[in-house]
């Protein structure tokens, strides 16, 4: 996205010239972002260093809100604010889509306007093509490359909730979904409303990339942003919608993705029982041949839910695994799935020995099992020890291991208690390595949001 905005700022031809010069000048040496900015600024002086400082060097993103002008003023205002209160401005070109709705037809795209947002705000007139519409709805980031937290006006947000799935342009549908997701994360849209919107898309969305994103967000919303009573209300609705999509899918890839989501979402007695029947071979998944990894995933879920005979299910699954590496992984993870919290704690304590962290993907899966939302309350006492081990994890593991360790540890939690543990850990260590502190803040961001929203 940054490169696209850089190209827009200097122009396509100068951008190409600059890239050629950059690659030629530094073909056999080291170069960084600032070297590219310097070359482009020489070609087309336009305060690129100031632009780069805000866009690249400093953290944060703008909040861009859409406001309707008063009666008799046919237009909208796009207001840009700096959430860090530093009065920064992110100059960029926005593509603003104007749409109308109809009860009998799909929403109609009336006009796309190119808008230059150079300061704190910009007024955008309602285009002539939209003035006869009874109600005009606006998507301020319809180009797909705009950067920021975009906040539509209430009418447009409601329109996206109810009608995003009927938008003809797949890019607009994708932008609409991301806008709804951001609205939920910012507590402007209730999680249950987001799930209602998702149900409209699950069966009908033809774009596989967008389906994948929606299913990921649905799973996270269900497990982290709903209260237990809300999950009980929504379990059957989501399970039925996803299973219907399994049956209706026309491609194996699509069917497999829906079935994977069904396994991850299953929490009602009926859904867990169905997974048990599929695992045992009593029931088939229409049009889908299950792999051994699928059956291992089902056995894992049955153990997490402590389904009747879960120990025997794990024993039976182990007896069917012929690949020695896969069997070793399965055996390694057994204790992380146990119903006894003390056995799970012992698994965690074993990770203090570097020899038991040799297979890092196995370690991360074990932590994810321990901290699964179903087991999260019992796992809270293990959060602080995991944070205390982080510096050693960085020294003894792969470069990506610390981020994975944190994601697996915090990924199932949504309680204020865990938020407080993380905050107290960092507050007590003012000299903690900045990179690791940043990773902790990044991993805990969703915990904080979920704790606040799901209260």
Predicted regions: what they are:
Residues 86-88, 99, 106-109, 125-455:
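Long, ordered, helix-rich scaffold segments
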Residues 48-49, 61-139:
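Beta-strand-rich binding/interaction modules
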Residues 1-77, 190-208:
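Amphipathic alpha-helical substructures
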Residues 57-58, 96, 152:
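Generic structural "secondary-structure junction" signal
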